[in-house]
Amino acid sequence: MSDNKTELNEEQHNATAEGEVSEETHQAEDAVEHDLEAMLEEARKEAESQKELALRTLADMENLKRRTRMDVESAHKFALEKFVNELLPVLDSMEMGLDASSKEDVTIDSIREGLDMTFKQFLDVMQKFNVERVNPTGEKFDPQLHEAMTMIPSPDHDSQMVIEVFQKGYVLNDRLVRPARVVVAE
């Protein structure tokens, strides 16, 4: 019987030890579970924060695209406004010249003087906006700037020289707008 009692005491002792181990394990598991839940909640908050940031960034990008599109449309729509404002005095001068030419006491010289002034005004506006005239009389023919309307033999000029300009060309900011239309020596 004493063996039984010893066995019983050992079993009780083992059961108590197992209970303590089981309770410690349970407490450790609870602590780990609590830590994991806290980490999960933190990750959820971070994910929500990142989602909000991404949505705000997306909205900002959409607003930027819309503003940029509107700015480009406005720039295209009003790109010539400064140029037109500079040309208005030229137009006014032409109109005054036309009105003056219909008067009885007007002379050809006064009309010519008015036309010369208006022409100079117009050229000044063009120069202000970097529009240059291409007037190549006496220069070597350049197919990048000139358009040969015809070629004629000319003993007075070297071959490929511009003899006459039918229509002057124009360059805007070093870019050809219209080639000079010319007669070239053969």
Curated annotation (Swiss-Prot):
Residues 1-13, 23-34 have a biased composition (Basic and acidic residues). GO terms for biological process: protein folding. InterPro entries: GrpE, GrpE_coiled_coil, GrpE_head. Its main location: cytoplasm. Keywords: Chaperone, Cytoplasm, Stress response. Pfam families: GrpE. Participates actively in the response to hyperosmotic and heat shock by preventing the aggregation of stress-denatured proteins, in association with DnaK and GrpE. It is the nucleotide exchange factor for DnaK and may function as a thermosensor. Unfolded proteins bind initially to DnaJ; upon interaction with the DnaJ-bound protein, DnaK hydrolyzes its bound ATP, resulting in the formation of a stable complex. GrpE releases ADP from DnaK; ATP binding to DnaK triggers the release of the substrate protein, thus completing the reaction cycle. Belongs to the GrpE family. Homodimer. This is Protein GrpE. It comes from Hydrogenovibrio crunogenus (strain DSM 25203 / XCL-2) (Thiomicrospira crunogena). The lineage of its organism: Bacteria, Pseudomonadati, Pseudomonadota, Gammaproteobacteria, Thiotrichales.
